[in-house]
C-alpha cells in the first residue's frame, strides 16, 4: 500500500488558465481550432472535478496544471468527460516513485518486492503520475504517460480489471481481441529479432493485452505514423473507439504546411 504524505500541494481554482501557452506543445499542434476549443472546455471541467495534488516537494502552477488537464482530455475529446468518472485525484510525484508490489506465482505463493513505477491507476482510486515523465509526454514520440494511464481507466470501464478490450459493442469484441493479439505477436517477433531497446514500438506492449492497448493508445495520439501503417486493421478499431483519427490530422497539417511554404515563393 502507498502511504500518502500528509503535506501536499493542491492546485487551486483559477479563472485565468493559460490555455494558449498550454496548447503550444507538439502533441496538440495538429488539432483544429474547433478541436482546441472543445478540448479546452473539457479541460476546464476536468480541473473543476479533479484535484491535482503535488507530492514530495513538487510544485504545480497554472501552466503545468492546464497542460496536464489538456492531455487527460485528449483521449476523451469525442467520448465526453463522463468517461473520466471513477477517480477524483491525480497525485503527482516529481520523479518515478517506489511502491511495494505483491504478486502471486504459478503455485500460489505471494511475493513482495519494491519496484519503481512511472504511474499507476486503478478502477476506483487516484491516478498517480510523475512530472519527469509528464514532461516527456508533451512531444510526438510515441511515449505519453498520461494517455497510458487514461487508457487503463477507459479499459476498466468494461469490467473490474483492465483487459485490453474497452467498452465497445459486443459484436466487435472478437475482432478487437484478434487484431490486438496479432499486434502483440508482431511486436514480440520484432523484439525477438532486434531486442527490446531497438524495437520500433515500446516492448511493454507485448507483455499483455491491457498494456498493449495502453501503449498503442500512446502511439495512436502521439505517433500515428508508427501505428497506422503497421497495424491498419487495429488502427481502424482505435479510430472507431476514440472517434478520432490522428493520422488524418497529421496529413491535413502536413498538407497545410506544404501549401504555406509554396505560397511564400
Curated annotation (Swiss-Prot):
Checking Pfam families in the record gives: Peptidase_M90
User: Which gene is annotated as encoding this protein in its UniProt record?
Assistant: mtfA
The free-text function statement in the UniProt record for this protein reads:
Involved in the modulation of the activity of the glucose-phosphotransferase system (glucose-PTS). Interacts with the transcriptional repressor Mlc, preventing its interaction with DNA and leading to the modulation of expression of genes regulated by Mlc, including ptsG, which encodes the PTS system glucose-specific EIICB component.
Provide this UniProt record's keywords sorted from A to Z.
Answer: Aminopeptidase, Cytoplasm, Hydrolase, Metal-binding, Metalloprotease, Protease, Zinc
Which SUPFAM superfamilies does the entry mention? Metalloproteases ('zincins'), catalytic domain
> Which organism is this entry from?
Salmonella typhimurium (strain LT2 / SGSC1412 / ATCC 700720)
Q: What is the lineage of its organism?
A: Bacteria, Pseudomonadati, Pseudomonadota, Gammaproteobacteria, Enterobacterales
Say yes or no: keyword Acetylation present: no
Source organism superkingdom:
Bacteria
The UniProt entry lists the main location of this chain as cytoplasm
The name on file for this protein is: Mlc titration factor A
Amino acid at each position: 500500500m502507498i502511504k500518502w504524505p500528509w503535506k501536499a500541494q493542491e492546485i487551486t481554482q483559477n479563472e485565468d488558465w493559460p490555455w494558449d501557452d498550454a496548447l503550444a506543445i507538439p502533441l496538440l499542434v495538429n488539432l483544429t481550432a474547433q478541436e482546441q476549443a472543445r478540448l479546452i472546455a473539457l479541460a476546464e471541467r476536468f480541473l473543476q472535478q479533479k484535484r491535482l495534488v503535488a507530492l514530495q516537494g513538487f510544485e504545480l502552477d497554472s501552466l503545468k496544471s492546464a497542460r496536464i488537464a489538456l492531455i487527460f482530455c485528449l483521449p476523451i475529446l469525442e467520448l465526453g468527460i463522463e468517461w473520466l468518472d471513477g477517480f477524483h485525484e491525480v497525485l503527482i510525484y516529481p520523479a518515478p516513485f517506489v511502491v511495494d508490489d505483491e504478486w502471486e506465482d504459478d503455485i500460489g505463493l505471494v511475493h513482495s518486492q519494491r519496484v519503481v513505477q512511472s504511474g499507476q491507476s486503478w478502477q476506483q482510486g487516484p491516478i498517480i503520475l510523475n512530472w519527469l515523465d509528464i514532461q516527456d509526454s508533451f512531444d510526438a514520440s510515441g511515449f505519453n504517460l498520461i494517455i497510458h494511464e487514461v487508457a487503463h481507466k477507459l479499459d476498466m470501464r468494461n469490467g473490474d480489471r483492465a483487459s485490453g478490450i474497452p467498452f465497445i459493442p459486443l459484436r466487435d469484441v472478437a475482432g478487437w481481441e484478434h487484431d490486438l493479439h496479432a499486434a502483440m505477436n508482431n511486436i514480440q517477433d520484432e523484439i525477438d529479432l532486434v531486442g527490446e531497446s531497438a524495437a520500433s514500438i515500446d516492448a511493454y506492449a507485448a507483455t499483455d493485452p491491457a498494456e498493449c492497448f495502453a501503449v498503442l493508445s500512446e502511439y495512436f495520439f502521439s505517433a500515428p505514423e508508427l501505428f497506422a501503417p503497421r497495424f491498419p486493421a487495429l488502427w481502424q478499431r482505435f479510430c472507431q473507439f476514440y472517434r478520432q483519427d490522428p493520422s488524418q490530422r497529421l496529413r491535413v497539417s502536413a498538407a497545410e504546411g506544404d501549401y504555406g511554404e509554396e505560397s511564400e515563393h
